[in-house]
Amino acid sequence: MVSWGRGKDAYYLYISREQEEDDDDSLSFYSSQKDTEDEFCGCLFPDPEIPGSSSSSGCSSSSTELYDLAAAHAALISRQQQILSQAIPIIPEHQLAAVAAHHQHHQQLHPSVQYQLVAAATHHNHHQPQAAQPHYSAVVPRSDVIQQPPHFALHHHLQNLVQQQQQQQAHHHHQQLVGEMALVSHTHPAAVGSTTCYEKNQQKQQQVQQIPTQPQVAHVSSNAILAAAQPFYPPPVQDSQPDRPIGYGAFGVVWSVTDPRSGKRVALKKMPNVFQNLASCKRVFREIKMLSSFRHDNVLSLLDILQPANPSFFQELYVLTELMQSDLHKIIVSPQALTPDHVKVFVYQILRGLKYLHTANILHRDIKPGNLLVNSNCILKICDFGLARTWDQRDRLNMTHEVVTQYYRAPELLMGARRYTGAVDIWSVGCIFAELLQRKILFQAAGPIEQLQMIIDLLGTPSQEAMKYACEGAKNHVLRAGLRAPDTQRLYKIASPDDKNHEAVDLLQKLLHFDPDKRISVEEALQHRYLEEGRLRFHSCMCSCCYTKPNMPSRLFAQDLDPRHESPFDPKWEKDMSRLSMFELREKMYQFVMDRPALYGVALCINPQSAAYKNFASSSVAQASELPPSPQAW
């Protein structure tokens, strides 16, 4: 059994011989994980599944403890060789022979697995094999690529190969005992006339790859909402934690459930009434297309999409994503102490994820603390792309201004602008920055007009040039109120109470510039001096793009610390989608879902026998009365 623990100096990998089945969840120290109580894990969040603890979208406001960034940074400098940023599934040495035999026929193996094979061969050339209790080979660190393929499927594939060879050997031994002349070939099992164990297992594996049109529940407890659509090997140990709702919004309901294929806790988002109208259909199609393309430390990625059993009943969508332990809103309102180091690391990660989105030609349009998921290691991920849309940076297209939660809405949106850019997301980051510094919402107004007035009270009356995208009614309202000077003293009080941190004041002013054309860009904000320490801490011990190899004197940093999206969305895609009817969009969405390969090669389905199924089926999105107020109709 493999698990991560954290000591005073580094992360450590625990290897137990009690269980040989690898769990990919325990090999990632920055993803959602169920933390056990041991002497190395003293700065973690409470378990998200225990009542009263924080979760990714729950309602609890209990105290949480964050990772000590300063201690981690100092520890990494002193003992960098002990840091393992990621590990691959470990193969017992007594099973490496099966992998080597398979390697003769399939030349393409993971480089780290080949490393183990070479190491094992070298070991056996110098030492005689001993019939002792099997031990595990050394852990090989990951490569320097951010987007790593999941190792879970590879490990289970190797387990299947090992089991196949064991079955062949047992069958061969049985044939010798009964005196039969036929021998089972390890390399050509099909040469045997009768059906061998190898062939039976091959047939079983082929059946697993075939996804039936009518899924049947398999390998699932009666309490689990998710079930595998077909049998698979090996059946994981069922998680005893109950499935439960953890949040809901205008476009979906999120539950914390167990993936029956891995035993890992994941977030299941239910999107009902997808085809209620054309706007809803476009919004859902945008969201799943975006989530499918994300591969970034600071952006929530899609794990799987449940395939509909029948296209005639394709009315709602079920999406699996990572499960995080809390969000930034719960941290801000909790009694947890936030140091300047925490603020710098959080703001840096928000901007880092936002750069990834903007370079993909995506506007999030709802950046707020509740949509910024955080785990106990202070890894932050941007989530909830229900209001996001693609955007042509060279052309200002007419878009709705009914976006962004009011407290974090940019002044151009409050003033009815129909043409806007990624500057609306930058304004939201500025509001969150101030909220982290003073532990309260910066502009907390009862309505949009009061919200605009609070902004003017702080920043002063804008010029005509700064209001060039606003509608005439909003301009007249601002001008009738008279001229107001900016409250510079209050800005300094928010960003620098001790009157020493002038860099924080400078960044806050640039993020909260009234004129969207003069507001700082995400690339410029990432290069601001205030965030230099946050960048250093993040890439010293938290990111997946930089790492430390054994016997290396220093940490290896990625060439691009703030990567761009690899394949930006073509602005024409949004225009082409606007020309389609709802029937055509439904067909495209169905084809997209069906063409996407299932995670681990095994499809999932909803289990109607689950004890929580009735509550899950009846769960609905937020009602109109629960939603924030609409923008002012100027």
From Swiss-Prot:
SUPFAM superfamilies in alphabetical order: Protein kinase-like (PK-like) (SSF56112)
Taxonomic path: Eukaryota, Metazoa, Ecdysozoa, Nematoda, Chromadorea
Catalytic activity: L-seryl-[protein] + ATP = O-phospho-L-seryl-[protein] + ADP + H(+); L-threonyl-[protein] + ATP = O-phospho-L-threonyl-[protein] + ADP + H(+)
Function: Has a role in the Wnt signaling pathway controlling the asymmetry of cell divisions during embryogenesis. Operates in the AB and EMS cell lineages influencing cell specification. Required for body wall muscle development, endoderm development, pop-1 asymmetry and T-cell division asymmetry. Component of the beta-catenin-lit-1 complex which promotes the phosphorylation, down-regulation and subcellular relocation of pop-1. Regulates plp-1 nuclear localization in embryos. Plays a role in male tail tip morphogenesis.
EC number(s) recorded for this UniProt protein: 2.7.11.24
Gene3D superfamilies per UniProt: Phosphorylase Kinase, domain 1, Transferase(Phosphotransferase) domain 1
UniProt note on tissues of expression: Expressed in the pharynx and seam and vulval cells.
Pfam families for this protein: Pkinase
Organism name: Caenorhabditis elegans
Ranges of residues in domain Protein kinase: 240-531
Subcellular location per the Swiss-Prot or TrEMBL entry: Cytoplasm, Cell cortex; Nucleus
Outcome recorded upon mutating residue 357 to S: In t1512; intestine cells absent but have an excess of pharyngeal cells, symmetrical localization of pop-1 and symmetrical T-cell division
Binding site for ATP: 246-254, 269
Family matches, as InterPro entries: Kinase-like_dom_sf, MAP_kinase, MAP_kinase_CS, Prot_kinase_dom, Protein_kinase_ATP_BS, Ser/Thr_kinase_AS
Catalytic site positions: 366
Biological process annotations from GO: anatomical structure morphogenesis; asymmetric cell division; asymmetric protein localization involved in cell fate determination; canonical Wnt signaling pathway; embryo development ending in birth or egg hatching; endoderm development; endodermal cell fate specification; intracellular signal transduction
Residue pairs linked by disulfide bridges in the UniProt entry: none
Listed PROSITE patterns: MAPK, PROTEIN_KINASE_ATP, PROTEIN_KINASE_DOM, PROTEIN_KINASE_ST
Subunit field text: Component of the beta-catenin-lit-1 complex (also called the lit-1/wrm-1 complex or the wrm-1/lit-1 kinase complex) at least composed of lit-1 and wrm-1. Interacts with wrm-1 (via N-terminus); the interaction is direct and activates lit-1 kinase activity which leads to the phosphorylation of pop-1. This promotes pop-1 interaction with par-5 and translocation of pop-1 from the nucleus to the cytoplasm. Interacts with pop-1 (when phosphorylated on 'Ser-118' and 'Ser-127'); the interaction is dependent on the beta-catenin-lit-1 complex.
Protein name: Serine/threonine kinase NLK
One MF term in the entry's GO annotations: MAP kinase activity
